[in-house]
């Protein structure tokens, strides 16, 4: 009877799936948030493209979700190769994949965190207004839009935190692999 994967591999899978789900939820909540209001006989629609930082966050969160789904598939494929015995002679390839995974995990975490913080900063103007520039508080008018945007950004922040933990998993995986003899 074959034993299942180690608990660290299971934890990485669960965390990757959670990060993919949270990033996708953030992108979907932000992407489908829109609200139309009539102000002084003029209909005005609030959409994420009105705030450039929100649009960038949607793209970044969707790309991060796709990346983590691909990494999850890689985890399952590597386990399948290890079970069938087909991956025995590719240590250098395994180290290269671990290095690429580490760098991409770090980059993905930084990208999602940076775009989320930029979107939060841009949305605080809509939430609080700027008296010096006579910008009104838009969230008093577009309440549902602001609530959906806030939920999307919370999902993206949770995904970024999970991605930071995943980069620690990737670092552990990379530095546990032995170097090839010619580099020692």
From Swiss-Prot:
Membrane topology per the entry is:
Multi-pass membrane protein
Q: Which Pfam families match?
A: CASP_dom
Q: Where are the transmembrane segments?
A: 14-34, 53-73, 110-130, 149-169
Question: Which cysteines in this chain are paired by disulphide bridges?
Answer: none
Provide this UniProt record's keywords sorted from A to Z: Cell membrane, Membrane, Transmembrane, Transmembrane helix
Q: InterPro entries annotated for this entry?
A: CASP/CASPL, CASP_dom
Give the subcellular location: Cell membrane
According to its UniProt record, where is this protein mainly located? membrane
Q: Which residues lie on this side of the membrane: Extracellular?
A: 35-52, 131-148
Would the keyword Transmembrane helix be found if you checked this record's keyword annotation?
yes
Tell me the protein family, please. Answer: Belongs to the Casparian strip membrane proteins (CASP) family.
How does this polypeptide assemble, per the annotation?
Homodimer and heterodimers.
From the Swiss-Prot or TrEMBL record, give the protein name. Answer: CASP-like protein 2C4
- What organism is the protein native to? Zea mays (Maize)
């Amino acid at each position: 009877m074959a034993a299942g994967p180690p608990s660290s591999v299971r934890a990485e899978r669960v965390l990757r799936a959670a990060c993919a789900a949270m990033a996708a939820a953030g992108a979907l909540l932000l992407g489908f948030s829109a609200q139309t209001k009539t102000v002084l006989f003029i209909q005005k629609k609030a959409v994420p493209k009105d705030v450039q930082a929100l649009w960038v966050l949607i793209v970044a969160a969707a790309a991060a979700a796709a990346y983590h789904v691909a990494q999850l598939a890689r985890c399952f494929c590597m386990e399948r190769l290890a079970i069938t015995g087909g991956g025995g002679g590719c240590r250098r390839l395994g180290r290269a994949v671990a290095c690429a995974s580490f760098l991409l995990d770090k980059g993905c975490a930084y990208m999602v965190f940076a775009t989320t913080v930029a979107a939060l900063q841009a949305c605080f103007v809509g939430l609080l207004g700027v008296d010096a520039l006579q910008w009104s508080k838009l969230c008093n008018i577009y309440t549902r839009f602001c609530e959906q945007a806030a939920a999307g950004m919370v999902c993206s922040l949770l995904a970024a935190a999970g991605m930071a933990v995943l980069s620690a998993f990737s670092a552990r995986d990379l530095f546990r692999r032995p170097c090839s003899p010619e580099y020692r």
